[in-house]
A protein has these predicted regions:
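Short, contiguous alpha-helical
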Residues: 21-24, 43-47, 51-54, 66-103, ...
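Surface-exposed helix-capping loop/turn segments at secondary-structure junctions
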Residues: 59-66, 128-138, 177-183
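N-terminal targeting signals for Sec/Tat export/insertion, comprising classic cleavable signal peptides
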Residues: 29-64
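Acidic/histidine-rich, surface-exposed loop or edge segments in extracytoplasmic proteins
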Residues: 27-39, 96-106
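Short coil/turn linker and secondary-structure boundary residues
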Residues: 60, 74, 105-108, 131
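Bacterial Sec-dependent N-terminal signal peptides
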Residues: 1-25
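Acidic/histidine-rich alpha-helical segments that form the ligand environment
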Residues: 108-145, 151-167
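Residues within well-ordered alpha-helical secondary structure of globular protein domains
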Residues: 59, 82-85, 119
């Protein structure tokens, strides 16, 4: 019996360590695309967001997640939920997949939100790669409540969700600094790499 419990605990610990060590997307920004097609430019913007988000959210503590500078502001955890929801929309737009509302993500943990957001951004970037201007006509932001669908052109994604995610990622960087846990000072957002 003791051997069985010990084996089970060892197995759980091993899987837990593997999950923690799993390399998430955007540790560094991907290589440049071959050309400046409209899809590649948008993909690069998504990659820039992914890189910033990766480092803004890496190593957050419980104190960081619950920190809020004022009573009426969002804390970091609430901001992570908000960004995750928008990352779903960024991922769905190239395939015109409806964003069904309301979406219940209340059970997601910090780790779930971080991994899910990074994977969504990676999928969105890959979906945009090498797309031309004509392809954008088929990309839609679609909100669905019940049977009612409201579509918007991809333009709204650029000035809406994509810009909003960049904005909120900056807020996370500021809030974690205020809570005493600043991001790694060796990050170069210009080069999309960690300085050696």
């Amino acid at each position: 019996m003791k051997k069985s419990i010990l084996f089970s605990l060892t197995l759980i610990f091993t899987f837990s360590m593997h999950a923690q060590n799993e390399e998430l997307p955007y540790h560094q920004i991907p290589e440049y695309p071959e050309n400046y097609s409209p899809g590649n430019v948008v993909a690069r913007m998504i990659d820039g967001l992914g890189f910033r988000y990766h480092w803004a959210t890496k190593g957050l503590t419980e104190k960081d997640l619950t920190y809020k500078p004022s009573e009426d502001g969002r804390n970091i955890m609430e901001t992570l939920f908000h960004i995750y929801g928008m990352s779903e929309m960024i991922k769905n737009a190239p395939t015109a997949t409806p964003n069904v509302r309301p979406m219940d993500i209340s059970e997601l943990t910090y780790e779930d939100l971080r991994k899910g957001t990074l994977k969504n951004l990676q999928a969105a970037s890959q979906a945009m790669a090498d797309k031309n201007a004509a392809d954008f006509e088929d990309f839609k932001v679609i909100f669905q409540r019940g049977e009612k669908q409201t579509p918007y052109p991809y333009w709204n994604m650029l000035n809406g969700m994509l810009s909003d995610c960049i904005y909120h990622t900056g807020q996370i960087t500021l809030l974690r600094r205020a809570s005493g846990n600043p991001i790694n000072p060796n990050i170069s957002v210009f080069n999309g790499r960690l300085r050696e």
